[in-house]
Amino acid sequence: MNNSTDAVNPAKKPQTRREKREAAEAFLKNVSDQSFPNSKKVYVQGEIHDIKVGMREITLSDTLVSGSKDKPVYEKNEPLCVYDTSGFYTDENVEIDVHKGIPRLRETWIDARDDVETFTSTHSEFAQQRLDDEGVDEIRFEHLPKMRIAKKGKNVTQMHYARQGIITPEMEYIAIRENLKREEVKDATLLLQHKGQSFGASIPEQITPEFVRDEVARGRAIIPVNINHPECEPMIIGRNFLIKVNANIGNSAVTSSIEEEVEKLVWSTKWGADTVMDLSTGRNIHETREWIMRNSPVPIGTVPIYQALEKVNGVAEDLTWEIFRDTLIEQAEQGVDYFTIHAGVLLRYVPMTAKRVTGIVSRGGSIMAKWCLAHHKENFLYTHFEDICEILKQYDVSFSLGDGLRPGSVADANDEAQFAELHTLGELTKIAWKHDVQTIIEGPGHVPLHMIKENMEEQLEHCGEAPFYTLGPLTTDIAPGYDHITSGIGAANIGWYGCAMLCYVTPKEHLGLPNKEDVKEGLMTYKIAAHAGDLAKGHPGAQIRDNAMSKARFEFRWYDQFNIGLDPERARTYHDETLPQESGKVAHFCSMCGPKFCSMKISQEVREYAANLDKNAIKIQLLDETITLTSDEAIERAMQEKSAEFKATGSEIYQLAE
C-alpha cells in the first residue's frame, strides 16, 4: 500500500528458450505479488445471492485546500474503484500456487442448480490418449478437477436460465461488477460527464441483475462461463455494457513453453484482458490448455479447428466431422468458454475472394476453404451446425462465429465475400438461439476509417443485435511494427458505434509472435480504445476515472496521477527520467514547462488571487490611490500581471527550470 513501485529490472532480458522458461518459472513462483501501487482488492456483497464481487480500489491522497506551510488544511479524496480482471492474483490474502490452480469461485453455484452431473472418464478419444501417454506425465497438470456435463434433457446455458426468468449468481455478479460502486461516489466533480452518442444502444443509468438477465435472454449479451471452468469470474459481452478487450496467447511449433504461456495469461489479466484466446498450434496443446484453464480468472476462447488440424498432421483435406467433434468435446470438458467456429465459410463464397488483393487471410477460414474445394462439398461446420449446438449447450460453451472471409487489407474491405459470410453468420445465430446457445459474431479486420460504421450497421441489421467482436479493425496497412496503433484507431471507433468486444493487436502483428511486453503494449492500446468508446457512447460513470485523473493533475498529486492511470509503472518511469528526485513527486509543476510556465500552476494562482476577494469586490492600495475591483476585474488584472511577467522573461513558451 505504499506509493513506490519497483525499479525497472536492469538485468539482461532472457534470450534462449531455456532462459525464457526459467524467467517464466521465476515469475510464476511470485505470482501472488501482482498488485498495483496504492491499490487493494475490495469485495462487494451480493443481495440476491451469497456472492462477493472483486474490484480494485485505488487509495488517493488528500487535496491541499488552504492553510499555511506550517498548518496546511487538507480535504480527503474518496478512493476510486476500477474494473479488475486480475482475479485472486492481486488479493494479498490469497496465496496462489499455479500447480494447484486458483480458487474455484463458481463451483458451488454450478452444483446448486442440480442440473449437471460429474464424471471422471473423458468422452474424448484424444483426451484419453493423452491421459494414457506416460511421456507427458512430467508436464501434466496434476490436480485435475472433476468434469461436469448437463444431466440428460437439461440445458445449462446462461441464456437458457435467462429465458426461464432466472437471475443466476453470475448475472448478479456482473451487475455489481459493471457498476463499480458508482452509487457511492459523492464528489460532484467525479460525476461530471458529457452526453454521448450511443447509436441506438439502450444503456441504463444503473445496471441491475434483471437488466443483465434480459439482455442475455434477448441474445444482445453473453456470459461466457463453461460449467467446467469454475475458476472464471463472470463477465458480460454486449453493447449495453462496458466494452471488453480480448488478448491472444498461444505457443507454436517453434516457440514458447507451458510456463511461458501461463505467465502470459497471468500477465494479460493483470493488464486488463477481459478474455484470453489460446491460439496454440504447437506441441502439447492439450496439456498447455489444462494449465491455462486451471489458472485463468477470465473466460478462455479457442479455435478448435487449429487443434483438429494438428491431429491430421496439418493436411486440411484430411479433416473430418468426427475429428472435429472429438476436439470440441475434449476442449469443452477442459472448460473452454467460447469457440471460434468458421461455419460461415461456404463453398459458394470462396470464388468471391479470387479478385482480392490479399485473398483469405484468416487461418481458420483458409483451412475450411481448402477443405471445401478439395472435397467440393459444403463446409462440414455449416452442415453439422445443429450438432455443434447440441454439444455446446451441455457445457455452456458460447459460439464466437468466426469471420473466415474477413478482409486482410483495406483494399478488400466491405466486399461481397465479407458481407455474404456475415449474413450467413446472422442465419446461424438464429439457429444457435433456438438451442439457447450464447453467440457472438466476429468481425474485421482491415477497414479504412470511413467504412467502419457500415460494418457495425450491417452486423446489427443481419445478426439480430448479437454482440460484435472485432480484430481492430486496422485503418491503414502502411505501418508494420505499429499495427497496435493503426488498429487501435479503428477499435475506438467501432467500439463507439456498438462493438461489444475488441480483440487486441500487438506491435508484432504481421511480423512475429508477441512476447510479454508486446502483449502489454497491445492491451494498453486496446484498453484506451475501449475506454474511449465507452466515453463516446456516454456509458454511465465512464468519465469518473478521467475526472479523478484531471483533478489529481490540476492539484499536482503526482503519485495519484501515476496510480489512477492504466499503467502506473510506465507513468512513473517516464516522469522520473526528467524529475527523478523525490521532490519532483510533490512539485507544483511538471518537466514539460518547468516551474515558471506550468499552465496549471498559473491557473491555480489566478484562482487563489480571485478566491481572496470578497464575494463581489476587493480594495487594492496602490501608491497614489485605492481602487476597488470586482471579481471579474481582479481576474483580468491577474491575467495582465502574468502577461507582463511572461514578456519580461523573454516571451518564450518553454524555459529551463531553475
UniProtKB/Swiss-Prot annotation:
GO BP: any one term: thiamine biosynthetic process
Keywords assigned by UniProt, alphabetized: 4Fe-4S, Iron, Iron-sulfur, Lyase, Metal-binding, S-adenosyl-L-methionine, Thiamine biosynthesis, Zinc
Residues that coordinate or bind [4Fe-4S] cluster: C590, C593, C598
Pathway this chain belongs to: Cofactor biosynthesis; thiamine diphosphate biosynthesis
Top EC class, one word: lyase
Residue ranges of the region described as Disordered: 1-22
Membrane among keywords: no
Amino acids binding substrate: N248, M277, Y306, H342, S362, R363, G364, D403, G404, L405, R406, E442, Y469
One function term, GO molecular function aspect: zinc ion binding
Signal peptide: none
Oligomer status and interactors: Homodimer.
Protein function: Catalyzes the synthesis of the hydroxymethylpyrimidine phosphate (HMP-P) moiety of thiamine from aminoimidazole ribotide (AIR) in a radical S-adenosyl-L-methionine (SAM)-dependent reaction.
Name this polypeptide is given: Phosphomethylpyrimidine synthase
Source organism of this protein record: Colwellia psychrerythraea (strain 34H / ATCC BAA-681) (Vibrio psychroerythus)
